[in-house]
């Protein structure tokens, strides 16, 4: 069963808090899977593995996420670390898909 959504202030036990964190984690994984589907589609559209790495686009994404993190009162450096990890994962995945397609024609 999905736990009932509670505001942080309404969580009175560690179990309450953990249930909410687990609920959010499931949502994050669902969003990552959705994002990954778009990354896969991008890899299908791109024709050269070098296209997977676009430093200008990456830095624009990082700047946008740092700003959003600040607006949400989150640590911008930690947000950047998370996004760089996500971007590196996606870039490497795209490169692999594109390179495999080029090899197999």
Locations of regions flagged by a protein language model:
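Domain-level signature for soluble enzymes in the chorismate/prephenate branch of the shikimate pathway
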Residues: 1-105
């Amino acid at each position: 069963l999905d736990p009932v959504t509670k505001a942080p202030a309404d969580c009175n036990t560690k179990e309450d808090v953990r249930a909410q964190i687990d609920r959010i984690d499931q949502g994050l994984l669902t969003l990552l899977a959705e994002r990954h589907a778009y990354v896969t589609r991008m890899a299908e559209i791109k024709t050269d593995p070098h296209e997977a790495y676009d430093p200008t686009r990456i830095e624009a994404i990082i700047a946008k996420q740092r700003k959003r993190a600040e607006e949400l009162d989150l640590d911008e450096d930690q947000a950047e670390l998370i996004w760089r990890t996500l971007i590196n994962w996606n870039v490497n995945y795209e490169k692999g898909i594109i390179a495999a397609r080029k090899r197999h024609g």
